[in-house]
């Protein structure tokens, strides 16, 4: 049986890294995408190849059309097909709305939302003829309810959810599933600057009484890819009950 292939944007660190590890260890060909974190990507690549797993790595700023296209072309050149696309690349720059510069707004929207359009559009050139595929967009609970001091981030993640729902309706007849995962507070670099007291408060406000781990989101992604054949257009809220 041929291996399936998963392309994961922004997969050198955090949630993307955990997804890459889990998919590679579950018999997928995996393409690790990075932009600035080359050392982290190489470290992950070396770890997985030493385990005898099928992985590649490719540098691309997916907020740029040409680089997004190059990433997809590379993946097809290596593995001939893309069965699972996970749009994970994202940035967050918390600040008051009145302090958001035009440059920051454009950077956040381009990285978090435009990249999803660019990569997905190119990948569909290969998924549509096969009438098969899973697209999983990593959004955020702030895309559902909005986050104070994260208006640009919240807008980008809400846009991902709208894209997910609309695209699922378009692609359903072609047997392509499109879903989103909306993580809560996850132990990644995005929260590394929060104080210990703030982290304890967030933990206390989460009914499951813990901060999420990247592996929690990776398990959701693998479930959707492996067992989610009758799930499409949905938002899986993996947030420990923080948002209900």
Predicted regions and their residues:
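Short, small/polar-rich loop/turn modules that mediate ligand/substrate recognition or access, typified
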Residues: 172, 177, 231-233
